[in-house]
Amino acid sequence: MSISSDEVNFLVYRYLQESGFSHSAFTFGIESHISQSNINGALAPPAALISIIQKGLQYVEAEVSINEDGTLFDGRPIESLSLIDAVMPDVVQTRQQAYRDKLAQQQTAAAAAAAAAAAATPNNQQPPAKNGENTANGEENGGHALANNHTDMMEVDGDVEIPSSKAVVLRGHESEVFICAWNPVSDLLASGSGDSTARIWNLSENSTSGSTQLVLRHCIREGGQDVPSNKDVTSLDWNSEGTLLATGSYDGFARIWTKDGNLASTLGQHKGPIFALKWNKKGNFILSAGVDKTTIIWDAHTGEAKQQFPFHSAPALDVDWQSNNTFASCSTDMCIHVCKLGQDRPIKTFQGHTNEVNAIKWDPTGNLLASCSDDMTLKIWSMKHDTCVHDLQAHNKEIYTIKWSPTGPGTNNPNANLMLASASFDSTVRLWDVDRGICIHTLTKHQEPVYSVAFSPDGRYLASGSFDKCVHIWNTQTGALVHSYRGTGGIFEVCWNAAGDKVGASASDGSVCVLDLRK
């Protein structure tokens, strides 16, 4: 048996990532030098740490149930071991002695019962069936115990379940798929994974059910040749014309690809993993945020860094453009900076969160900035004020992400009300009327942390994805659940295509699913 600290650290790091502890994973990864290890993350299956712990727990339970003579204790376990019990020698020894005592009692009771049965049971009378054996009516004695079992999954009306005929599952990734995004002008779906690849899937009508995939391998130069980086693809974004795809990776490089899968540029100035990147609307600049505490504006045509902004005191987690040359960034330092190309200091700084700021989004007009944090609050900011306009407190766990609806002034749906959606580790999604500063709907069907929300292009529906493996589609006006799909892995990201008739979702088991919502 061989166990190295690097291997243990890698499995712990992957567990933190898979469980949604992205900031803890980052800190642990830096302190344990994960990026310097030679372990190929693409070869490790999802939930590897949990799997090996479960096997170890089963071994301890088996060890407890072995008698001194090497035979197995013949009976059901008194109770299964908890993980904490299994690592405590006193508990294991006590449990072993309990098994031995139980065995002695059973042997004594069996001998007494046999003697009594021989004296009292007529020859034509059968003894009652043991628990688990079939009785005359074909049911198991003790079947009532099964009837009392219940599932932890929330009941979903069968009328809203999306049939398998309306779901296409795309397989090819060899590790978790953290992100996905539709091309804004065609039915091409991009996905990014822990297997150090991004993929472009063709879901158009003339494609063979998504079988067409382009593999974008993220490589680095070593020894004069290109080798796989073995690092997660953490972010991706299409330009507004749908001709180019930008990706950010844990290897510290941003890359620009054509929609045909060809590498156009490699952008290398960050000194560590990239957590977020965005095209501006014009398509001439790309904005990235990194663990090195900086944000960078890149010239998309030349691949050169136009300006690096070193204003955060801790890793930058998210960025969003306000205009073609002005943007906001947030960080684990609890601050939000608004910066402009050509300015050597932030033009505005918002402070008020008391924990890491996970995500920021400008509303469609660029007037209001929403932010969400591990402090469980959602805040709305305006460039006209130094303090937040609204401090929305309703979630009881960390808020992971937020999205504005594509409605109201400045959108294609100007007559519909503007809304904001928030997704939290408390397993709920909330819809907010920002003008009034109130929550108008609380969406509660999920059973695990919710990692992603996305509005349909007309704003009438909201998709949500959770680690409970479910994608739910909600009516934004009524808060009613209208569609539901259960996948095969925890959902990290959901997104709508431009036509508003398909939803893409990326999952922890390496799958990407596409839900066809056309009737």
UniProtKB/Swiss-Prot annotation:
Q: Where in the cell is it found?
A: Nucleus
Q: Which UniProt keywords apply?
A: Activator, Chromatin regulator, Nucleus, Repeat, Repressor, Transcription, Transcription regulation, Ubl conjugation pathway, WD repeat
Q: Which GO terms describe its molecular function?
A: transcription corepressor activity
> Which segments carry the region annotation Disordered?
115-147
UniProt WD repeat ranges: 172-211, 228-267, 269-308, 311-349, 352-391, 394-442, 445-484, 486-519
Give yes or no: UniProt keyword Signal.
no
Taxonomic superkingdom: Eukaryota
Q: Which InterPro entries match?
A: Ebi-like, G-protein_beta_WD-40_rep, LisH, WD40/YVTN_repeat-like_dom_sf, WD40_repeat_CS, WD40_repeat_dom_sf, WD40_rpt
Q: Which GO terms describe its biological process?
A: chromatin organization; regulation of transcription by RNA polymerase II
- The biased composition feature labelled Low complexity covers 115-139
One GO cellular component this record assigns the protein to is: histone deacetylase complex
**Keyword Protein transport on entry:** no
Domain (LisH): residue spans on this chain: 4-36
| Subunit organization | Interacts with heterodimers of rxra and thrb, and this interaction is abrogated by thyroid hormone binding to thrb. Interacts with ncor1.
Q: Which family does it belong to?
A: Belongs to the WD repeat EBI family.
**Annotated domain remarks:** The F-box-like domain is related to the F-box domain, and also functions to recruit ubiquitin E3 ligase complexes.
This chain's function reads: F-box-like protein which acts as an integral component of the N-CoR transcriptional corepressor complex. Probably regulates transcription activation mediated by nuclear receptors. May mediate the recruitment of the 19S proteasome complex, leading to the subsequent proteasomal degradation of the N-CoR complex, thereby allowing cofactor exchange and transcription activation.
UniProt-recorded name of the protein: F-box-like/WD repeat-containing protein TBL1XR1-A
Organism, by scientific name, is Xenopus laevis
